[in-house]
Amino acid sequence: MAVTAALVKELRERTAAGMLDCKNALVEANGDIELAIENMRKNGQAKAAKKAGRIAAEGVILTKVANGVATMIELNSETDFVARDEGFIAFGSKLIEVASANKINDIETLNDSVVDGVKVSDARDTLVAKIGENISPRRVISVEGDNLGAYVHGGRIGVIAILQGGDEELAKDIAMHVAAANPQFVKPTDVPAEVVAKEKEIQLDIAMQSGKPADIAEKMVSGRMNKFTSEVSLTGQAFIKDPSTSVAQLLKAKNADVINFVRFEVGEGIEKKEEDFAAEVAAQMAAAKK
């Protein structure tokens, strides 16, 4: 079968691949567009597998609250530029919808889920081949509760807040506060004993180095430890929208309590590859001479 311009155009529209790639694929498939797509998809998957080894530390956080379920996903890319790509954003939107509908809590289940008749893992491979970067759903969580709030700041920090009592506005305000203040625990009493002991050791050392007597240093540190546990816990912090009141006071006034919260930040815990620009240029120049 002849490879026509119309066939090349159709293949480009269906695969988003380059014109030359589409023409070559059609020639190899003797004009059979379905076979060409199959071959290109196989090729795309091979490229995706190769790119999967790259570090994906940029990306976006997505949240959704519906039907008593709050869901949050971190979807990673290699660069911030791709994180703003329409195809990347559309893929993320589909992921959050399927994760919310099925209350998904692990990446394996998410990758095995189906969107638009295609497995998420296959859709991801196709997108990687199209965009040319490693793309990876990194983590997902779905929680149920009576009063759920979600907040995303700049696409990079996302929070789910689980409350008992209060209203929707309060739940969202608490999620917003967690995004901004980054508390490590819900209440001061939740701070583990080993964390308190370590901080006390540090503060005692600081006090003793300042020349304070041991008994005075101990009293000073006791006051500092109360401040420390308040600063690292949600309810002990000053409310971000009204610093004159604490989060604990706000919750009491609203007859509410925070059961828990979950905070995602894009790329946290991922060690980004440090690029040596001079070495990269030298390598490119050496390759060009070959």
UniProtKB/Swiss-Prot annotation:
Residues 79-82 are annotated as: Involved in Mg(2+) ion dislocation from EF-Tu. The keyword Cytoplasm applies. One of its GO terms (molecular function) is translation elongation factor activity. Keywords: Cytoplasm, Elongation factor, Protein biosynthesis. Signal peptide: none annotated. Disulfide bonds: none annotated. CDD domains: UBA_EF-Ts (cd14275). Its main location: cytoplasm. InterPro entries: EF-Ts_dimer_sf, Transl_elong_EFTs/EF1B, Transl_elong_EFTs/EF1B_dimer, Transl_elong_Ts_CS, UBA-like_sf. It comes from the Bacteria. Belongs to the EF-Ts family. Associates with the EF-Tu.GDP complex and induces the exchange of GDP to GTP. It remains bound to the aminoacyl-tRNA.EF-Tu.GTP complex up to the GTP hydrolysis stage on the ribosome. HAMAP family: EF_Ts (MF_00050). This is Elongation factor Ts. It comes from Pseudoalteromonas atlantica (strain T6c / ATCC BAA-1087).
